[in-house]
């Protein structure tokens, strides 16, 4: 977080997280293994060392292994492309000098690759905190405009602690001079 007296900037980490690297690698290795086992059962040539995949019948085991391997390789390709393109990264800039809030994110390649939202500070109604506990906890901060749009300000990934999210939301609300919603 970069803060001056009148300007506050939050960097947002995109898809280049350690967990994404881990899962993209694991899925790629698993997919390649399944694909090579299926191909070995068809060609009757051992393509994967330390296995006896030539003993498998191509129909139905080998073809299913090839299908699952291909699906996993495609999913892994998608994950690697989101990492390379750094989808979701960007920054939130709150500038009281010129009265603007800028939300900048990188998207998928194409005409809408760069997502840049600008709002005047006087058009902002509140800072909203949404906390949902359970199996998949959700702790997010939203910028709520006067026309009731809610723009997420927090990054995807590990949820922040309750103390962190309350502190950050309270600071933003005070910095922008708006009310804080969702904290009881």
Curated annotation (Swiss-Prot):
It is a multi-pass membrane protein. Its main location: plastid. One of its GO terms (cellular component) is chloroplast thylakoid membrane. The chain crosses the membrane at residues 21-41, 63-83. It comes from the Eukaryota. It is found in: Plastid, Chloroplast thylakoid membrane. GO terms for biological process: photosynthesis. InterPro entries: PSI_Ycf4_assembly. HAMAP family: Ycf4 (MF_00437). PANTHER family: PHOTOSYSTEM I ASSEMBLY PROTEIN YCF4, PTHR33288. Belongs to the Ycf4 family. Seems to be required for the assembly of the photosystem I complex. This is Photosystem I assembly protein Ycf4. It comes from Gracilaria tenuistipitata var. liui (Red alga). The gene is ycf4.
């Amino acid at each position: 977080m970069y803060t001056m007296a009148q300007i506050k900037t939050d960097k947002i980490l995109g898809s280049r997280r350690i967990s994404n690297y881990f899962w993209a690698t694991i899925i790629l290795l698993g997919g390649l293994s399944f694909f090579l086992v299926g191909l070995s059962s068809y060609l009757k040539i051992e393509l994967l060392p330390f296995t006896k995949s030539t003993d498998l019948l191509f129909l139905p085991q080998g073809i299913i292994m090839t299908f699952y391997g291909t699906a996993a390789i495609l999913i892994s390709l998608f994950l690697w492309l989101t990492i390379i393109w750094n989808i979701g990264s960007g920054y939130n800039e709150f500038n009281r000098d010129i009265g603007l809030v800028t939300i900048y994110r990188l998207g998928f390649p194409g005409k809408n690759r760069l997502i840049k939202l600008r709002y005047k500070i006087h058009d902002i109604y509140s800072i909203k905190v949404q906390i949902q506990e359970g199996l998949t906890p959700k702790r997010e901060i939203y910028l709520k405009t006067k026309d009731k749009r809610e723009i997420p300000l927090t990054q995807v990934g590990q949820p922040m602690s309750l103390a962190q999210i309350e502190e950050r939301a309270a600071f933003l609300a005070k910095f922008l001079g708006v009310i804080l919603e969702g904290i009881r």
